[in-house]
A protein has these predicted regions:
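Short regulatory helix/loop adjacent to the ATP-binding pocket of P-loop NTPases
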Residues: 1-10, 23-29
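Short, flexible helix/strand-to-coil boundary loops that buttress conserved ligand/catalytic motifs
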Residues: 8, 22-25, 49, 163-167
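Hydrophobic/aromatic beta-strand patches that form the interior of the parallel beta-sheet core
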Residues: 9-12, 153
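Accessory nucleic acid-recognition modules appended to NTPase machines
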Residues: 51-172
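Amphipathic alpha-helical "lid/sensor" segments that cap RecA-like P-loop NTPase cores
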Residues: 26-64, 71
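Acidic/polar active-site rim loop that often engages polyanionic ligands
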Residues: 2-6, 16, 38-39, 62-66
C-alpha cells in the first residue's frame, strides 16, 4: 500500500502465470512445467537451483513469515486448529467449504469448540494475506448467497500443502 496525501493505493500482485514463469525459466518447457507444478509461480523460486532450496524457501516463507504474521496480527490463540484449517482447505481445494460443518467436525473429531464465525474469520485472515482466494457460486441469486458455501483456492502452490496432483491441477 502506498500513501500519498492521505490517499492509498493497494496493488495486489499475483504469482507469475505459467507463461511468465516459463519465459523467465530459460530452459525447455517441460522442465519449466515441472518446476512450476511443484514449486509455484513465486519469482524468487526461479533463482533457487536445488529442489531442497526451493522447498526450504517456500516452507519458510509460508510458515515462518505468513503464518507468524497472521497469528500475531490477529492474536490467534487456537494456533493448532488454525493450522489444521489450512490443511483442510488445502486438501479440499475446489470443494464447497462450509464453516458451520467445519465447526461441527472440530467438535466431533477433536472435541474442540470453534465457532463457525471464528472459522470464517480465520479464512478471511488467509484471504487478506493473499494466501487463499474465494470463489462464489454463480448459479445462485439473491438471498441464497447468504450462508452459501464457497470454494477456496490457494493464490500460489506451496509444495508442502499439495495432497494430490488432481487437487493441484484444480488449484491452477
Amino acid at each position: 500500500v502506498t500513501d500519498f496525501r492521505g490517499r492509498g493505493d493497494e496493488i495486489h500482485m499475483l504469482p507469475l502465470s505459467f507463461s511468465e514463469f516459463s519465459s523467465a525459466y530459460g530452459s525447455n518447457i517441460s522442465d519449466a512445467w515441472d518446476d512450476y507444478f511443484n514449486y509455484g509461480g513465486l519469482p524468487l523460486v526461479l533463482s533457487k537451483q536445488l529442489p531442497e532450496e526451493k522447498e526450504e524457501y517456500l516452507l519458510s516463507l509460508f510458515k515462518e513469515l505468513y503464518l507468524t504474521v497472521i497469528i500475531e496480527r490477529h492474536n490467534i490463540r487456537n494456533v493448532e486448529e488454525f493450522n489444521e484449517l489450512i490443511d483442510i482447505l488445502a486438501s479440499s481445494v475446489g470443494s464447497l467449504t462450509n464453516p458451520l460443518k467445519l465447526s461441527k467436525t472440530f467438535k466431533s473429531v477433536k472435541n474442540k469448540t470453534i465457532r463457525d464465525a471464528t472459522i470464517t474469520k480465520y479464512i478471511e485472515y488467509l484471504q487478506d494475506a493473499f494466501i487463499v482466494d474465494k470463489a462464489v457460486r454463480f448459479d445462485i441469486k439473491g438471498k441464497k448467497y447468504i450462508g452459501s458455501p464457497a470454494k477456496y483456492y490457494f493464490e500460489d502452490i506451496v509444495s508442502e500443502m499439495k495432497p494430490t496432483d488432481v487437487l493441484l491441477l484444480e488449484n491452477l
